[in-house]
Structures are given as C-alpha cells and as structure tokens.
C-alpha cells in the first residue's frame, strides 16, 4: 500500500498540470496530495517522511506554492493552509470535498501513537498567515502596533513581511488628529483595495504571492471615529478594530472567513494590555517605547483623543517594571514612557499613604477630579530610575498641569532621567487658551517655565502649537509668536488647526480662520521658532555631552557615528578607538571602537543650529559620566 501511495504521489508531483482528480490546474492547490500523503506517512518508512509532514489529526497539513503551468509546482514547507482555505478556492473536477475529508478523517483515526508523537510542525508552517503593517501618527500608535503583533503571534500569525502583496493580513494603524493624516490613510486603503482585486487576477495565472486575498484591517483612532464610513467604502476594508479591542482581532479575522465584516470599536475603562509583552518592530534597536497609561480626561476643545482613546487608566507599576526589565535584558539602553497624558499616571491598584493629595502645577487646573489616588508618575519614575540605573528614561506626551514640584526635583536628582521636558503650550494668548479649555493662562505657563529652569538649570524644553484656532485674531497670533521667543524652545511641533468632529470646538465654535491665513500664521510661527532654537544648540558648544550611539551617520556612514544627548540633541562624531572607562576600572586599558548602544562622552565643537558635531573622548556609562572625577586620573595615566 505504501509503494502504491508513493507512486501515485510521485505521479502527481511530476505532472505540470497538477492532479486530474482535484482542482483546476494552475489556479489551485491539490487536495489529493494531502490525502495521499497521510496514507504514505502511515505506511512508509522514514524515507518518505523526509518529503512530507506527518498527519497529526483530521486537519492534515501540506504546503506548496501556487501551481504554474510552465514550471509545475513544488512543495514549500514554510507556509501552510487548512482544508477550509483550499475548499473555498475552486471547483472540483472529480470526487467531492466531503469524500476526501471523510476518507482522510477515517484514516487519521488509525494513526499510530508513534506518528502522533512526531515533532511538531515548524513554527512557520503552523502560521495562519503573513502580516504586513503600516503605522501613522504618534508613538502610542507604534507601541500599539507592537501589542497587536504580540496578540497575533500568540494566535498563530507568526510571520511579518515587508511586501503587502505577500501578506494574508494587512494592518493599517491610523491617526485621526488632523485631516491630512486621514487623507494619507484613505490613499493607502485605495491601494490595498487594488491589491485585493489584483490578487484574483494573479491567482488565476499562478502568480499570486499570498495564499489568499489579503484581509485589510483598520486599527487606531480612525477606526473608532469613521467606522461606518470605512466599512461602507466599496469593500475596501474587512475589519475595523479600535484601540481598546485589539485582543478581539483573531476572532474578527475569523468572521471574515465566513463572509462577515469584523468590527469592534468599543472603548474600555480598564484595558491597558498590561499582561502583553509587545513584539518589537525594530528587534535590534537600543531604544524602545513602553506604554504606561492610556486615554485622556482633559477634554481640550480641539482634541479628538478622548473620543477615540477613551478615559484615562494606568498600568500597574509592577507590569511596567517587568516589561522594562525584559527590554534591559534584550540590550535596550533607552526607554520612552508613553501615554496620551503620561504624567497624569495614577496606579490606583497600589497602596498610597493616607493624606496624600493630588497636586497640579501652580496656577493650573483640571476639569476632571481624581477619585482614587494611587502611585503617581513621580513614584513610577522613582522606581524605574533606581532599579535600572544604566538605562536612560524619557517620557511623552504630558500636560503642563501635571508637573508638581516632586516630579521636577526627581528629574534634577536622577542622572538617568533625561533633562528634557515637553511642555505643550498650544497658544500664547490667554483667551484662546480658555477657548481651548487648557486650564491655564499665558502667565501661569511662563511662571511654570521659570520654575522648571530654576530647579533644572540645563533643561531642554519642547512644545506643541496650533495656529488659526477658532476665532483667533492677528493680535492673539502675535502673542503666540512672542511666547515662542520668550521661552526659547529646543524643538516644537507646529500645525495649522484642523477641525475634528465630536470635539467641543466642533459642537460649539466656528472654524472661521481661512486656510490661507492658517498657513501664513504657521509659516510665521516656524520662522519665530527657528530664530530661538539656534541659541539652544549654540550654547552646547564647548560642553561635554553623554551621547547614546544609535548608528552610523548617514552623511558619512564609513567614518562617523550619530546619537542623542539626554536633551534630545543629535550629535555626530568621527569614530576612532577609545578607552572604555568601565574597563579601565577593571584594569583593562585596551582601546576599542564605539558601537551602537554605547554611551560615548563627546566634547561639542560645532553647532549647525539643528544638530551638533564633536570629538569623542571615551566610552562611558551614565553612572561614571555623572561622577567623572573618580576615573579621570585613571584615564590620564593610561593615555600617558
């Protein structure tokens, strides 16, 4: 029986037109191969098992590339497909699918224990489908995509590809903060719709790169905001999933297999994905994002985030410590803590000393009262900076109201918390700030800047600004320009106002500033920023900065490296052999070239007012750099 089955199988494999008993040649996979392989596997010796995977149950697996009339077809053990996938792809010329399944199941029941104990299928073979993904918008979306990849990996989708034509699932993680961001997404969805149509043509000629037409999945803020419009858009999208429903993605994708649209955009009061270890998009990166809280309670008039991301909720401290520990073990040297309003972090699952009060920045207020006070953002930073003394920490995006003195003094005293504060102003006029529902005045904002610089003298301050908000006059716009000049920001994100549906502004205000006026004011704002940011960079010339090396400088990849200081300034330098201060303390005075992930002390020699250039002095560590007097004598003696 074994020789007969193998003979039949060999005949099929040698036939360039496939199996005459099964699906139409050149367009489909051959189901007969699966049935015959189960019989051959059961009865043959180990020589036959080298060709085909073992049958494990009624869902026998065998993978192969699409049939090509000119080249025949070949077995490909890197992919897999199920009986239901094959059955839905074509018509029979011979025995029915029911007959094949019945015979295969009957034979599988006779499988010996020895066969059942064979090694499991390769992880790639067991993959349910290949994933292609694109992400638009903020860092939170990047981190969310890593959470999605982890969920999909645990559900059997183990392979990520860089070509959308090779994918069975296409994820588009979207941003709804501005109209331009949404327009880019619609353009991409049109392209993916074209790929779905093209797949049918390619499959008919054996040229399809994926096993099935791709399922297009919209994630993120647009999913919640425009779910009905997206699903009605001429079958462009198969699944719409909001930021709090990513655990439901495997089920939603299965619904598509049954001809249904998959949709879940419910917002949650509890979901933080605290138990999920994200699959890093850049596996070898020495920097990473870690989400510590989700949602926002501030309800600013212009902002769609509370409506697409929901209310604030924070991860437990211990889950964050665990994730950062995993990153440290994998070689990550810098972590950016993320949240829509990151410094309003409140782990109310933890105990807090009685009598503690929720403090805001002086002169700032909030529209949302805190019901249960737990561990705050300063408590989280305190734990992280102590437990990981050689890891650098940043955080974004905060609200100016949540900078109590406790947080500022902690940033001053901990060497591994970056001297960088993001302080979104949005406007420099008090009336517009009130219209925006920001909870502070121009004067309160400037007082906070003054306090920050008195506590952390060498701090870098960055900001966000909106031009052309509803009812903004020329005089009010000029006050924004004067605020930029007064503060002197190291960096700023600046945009023309874009009205968003559902927001307070959409319900109550008129978008009455003409688009050309918005753009002109934006240009003036950018010019004012450039006038003041140059001195921030120029002031670094002559100083020694600790630079975390991120890779070769693209302008001179063979000779220069580039990295960032704790203030976020880009610094490039010529690579050369350097002493490693940590090794010097152990008596090793050999020099080596710095590499990605090294902290390098660099003396700044030149400023381009957008980046810095300097001379590398030594490879170091954060703890050594901030106590350099201890090892300077050792370095000098070795150099002599």
Curated annotation (Swiss-Prot):
[4Fe-4S] cluster 1 binds at residues 138, 175, 221. Pfam families: Radical_SAM (PF04055), TRAM (PF01938), UPF0004 (PF00919). One of its GO terms (molecular function) is methylthiotransferase activity. Residues 538-618 form the TRAM domain. Residues 129-258 form the MTTase N-terminal domain. [4Fe-4S] cluster 2 binds at residues 296, 300, 303. Residues 282-535 form the Radical SAM core domain. It comes from the Eukaryota. The keyword Iron applies. GO terms for biological process: regulation of cyclin-dependent protein serine/threonine kinase activity; tRNA modification. Binds 2 [4Fe-4S] clusters. One cluster is coordinated with 3 cysteines and an exchangeable S-adenosyl-L-methionine. The keyword Signal does not apply. Its cofactor is [4Fe-4S] cluster. This is CDK5RAP1-like protein. Keywords: 4Fe-4S, Iron, Iron-sulfur, Metal-binding, S-adenosyl-L-methionine. Potential regulator of CDK5 activity. InterPro entries: Elp3/MiaA/NifB-like_rSAM, Methylthiotransferase, Methylthiotransferase_CS, Methylthiotransferase_N, Methylthiotransferase_N_sf, MiaB_methiolase, rSAM, rSAM_horseshoe. Belongs to the methylthiotransferase family. MiaB subfamily.
